[in-house]
Amino acid sequence: MPKIAVLPGDGIGQEIIPQAVRVLKAVLAETDAEFEFQDYPIGGAAIELVGKALPDETLQGCREADAVLLGAVGGHQWDHLPASERPETAALLGLRKGLNFYANIRPVRMIPSLLATSTLKENVLDGVDMVVIRELTGGVYFGEKGRSDNPRSAYDKMTYSEEEIRRILIQGFETAMLRSKKLCSVDKANVLETSRLWREIANELAKEYPEVELTHMYVDNAAMQLVRNPKQFDVIVTENMFGDILTDLASMLGGSIGMLSSASLSGTQGMYEPAHGSAPDIAGKNLANPLATILSAALMLRYSFGMEAEALRIESAVEKVLEQGYRTGDLAQAGDKVVGTIEMGDAVLAAL
């Protein structure tokens, strides 16, 4: 029986994960598939429970699972801890490294009924449909770092191996093959040696994918182009820090970061989570938007279990709910039906 490790985490994670699980169970109930759902603590909740953000039991449970569904981690009450012990570092980076989730996939699509929610013009956004692929376990976030005194200074080392670059670029090419056969590799090869190696390997791999149109773009230009003309992009592939920044920027192309789903893949497993954080300011108030988490559950069915029809059912239900005018506060405009977290989950279930 396939096993899903469920990690609600902190803040609104405790509210949005139950809605995604409800939707998953409803869809799976109409198939012959039987799944086991097992909850584990992570993040600040785990610190309070056992004294560490990523308990051994949680890491082992995730290793034994076929897929991981994660809510969000972090909160101001743990900011006093050393950086290496905070939920965002110890839990998220530890999980990514421990399970070798090296590829982060974030679909960005403007749903027509949400065009008015973005700060960008409708003619710029209408038709936006792209995938951003971010390398997740290398680069400056995982490099050697430190500080010295007299005078005070700090350093963070960025390193990439050929293997790390090659495997994420292959993910980019393979994804492009399934879509419009257009791949934009984003780097900073005019300044960074790691980016020059990245570009070399991308050009080498392009010979193995002659059907894919490969282009290169510097990250600063990519940020500008995502706002100026986002429809030029179909698949973007980039390194860890650049991807971290660009995916948050791209989230506004879909109306709200509350709509941005995410899949993190290894060769054998997947972890699925919304792109937003734990939002402690609205936690426990039934205000959080669960749609990114529900859409992440759809990605789980697609990537980890090959259940494309069921994934499409969830995505269609989300679109239907939005077309009916249901909105959580982050998406609300005048005249919309503003609902809470639970009510939005109810609406998606009804739309199924």
Curated annotation (Swiss-Prot):
Its main location: cytoplasm. Substrate binds at residues 96, 106, 134, 220. Its cofactor is Mg(2+); Mn(2+). Keywords: Amino-acid biosynthesis, Branched-chain amino acid biosynthesis, Cytoplasm, Leucine biosynthesis, Magnesium, Manganese, Metal-binding, NAD, Oxidoreductase. The record marks 141, 188 as: Important for catalysis. It catalyses: (2R,3S)-3-isopropylmalate + NAD(+) = 4-methyl-2-oxopentanoate + CO2 + NADH. It is an enzyme of class 1 (oxidoreductase). One of its GO terms (biological process) is L-leucine biosynthetic process. Pfam families: Iso_dh. One of its GO terms (molecular function) is 3-isopropylmalate dehydrogenase activity. It is found in: Cytoplasm. Pathway: Amino-acid biosynthesis; L-leucine biosynthesis; L-leucine from 3-methyl-2-oxobutanoate: step 3/4. The keyword NAD applies. NAD(+) binds at residues 277-289. Its EC number is 1.1.1.85. Gene3D superfamilies: Isopropylmalate Dehydrogenase. Mg(2+) binds at residues 220, 244, 248. GO terms for cellular component: cytosol. NCBIfam families: leuB. Belongs to the isocitrate and isopropylmalate dehydrogenases family. LeuB type 1 subfamily. Homodimer. This is 3-isopropylmalate dehydrogenase. It comes from Desulfitobacterium hafniense (strain Y51).
